[in-house]
Curated annotation (Swiss-Prot):
Involved in chromosome condensation, segregation and cell cycle progression. May participate in facilitating chromosome segregation by condensation DNA from both sides of a centrally located replisome during cell division. Probably acts via its interaction with MukB and MukF. It comes from Haemophilus influenzae (strain ATCC 51907 / DSM 11121 / KW20 / Rd). GO terms for cellular component: cytoplasm; nucleoid. The keyword Cell membrane does not apply. This is Chromosome partition protein MukE.
Amino acid sequence: MTDIQDVISPKLAVAIANPIFPAVDSLLRSGRHISTEHLDNHAFLMDFQNELDGFYRRYNVELIRAPEGFFYLRPKATTLIARSVLSELEMLVGKVLCYLYLSPERLAQQGIFSTQEVYDELLNLADEGKLLKAVNQRSSGSDLDKQKLAEKVRAAIGRLRRLGMIQTVGEQNSGKFTISESVFRFGAEVRSGDDPLESQARLIRDGEAATPDSLALEKQAQLMENDTKSADEIDEEFDGEQE
């Protein structure tokens, strides 16, 4: 029988025994990003980052600390932890949130934005016709089509809120929120750019909604096509967790 000390280091044992671990573990497994706004959770991950990264690698995921300081789990193609996939519109909304995070308006408005501002900025930066077609291929640009697009944007913002990208301000349904630095999951391409704001705007205009992580996962999925599994089995494994 394997000695437990051969598997778990003393410091990892301390981390797992910490009362905060179950909550942090559940948040990470659900896809949540933990930023500096979450003081206790973030401090816990800072203290035990190396030990917990080794722990999660046994599930074929990595505990990542981004340059901006936030933590999240990045799955490999063979992950044992269920993952969900963002839609193209959700990723595009994420890029708009990153654009707003970089904008001068964030300071002018004390960092508070509204759902309507995200929608308006999306229409300002992206092609409205393409957005409407993404919601309904037969879109004629009617008011009903625009209403459906607005509903999809609100749903995307709600999804990103659950992932820790934004924090609600005031009542739950106020439509007001602050943007976390974790939106840089959608802005990794502009970290080294000369003008991050303009670079992000260009990415949105060009419809480049994929993130580096999503592109890596796509490449890994293509490599897995040579596996002995059938196409149906592959679809079930990699896409079955989509919300």
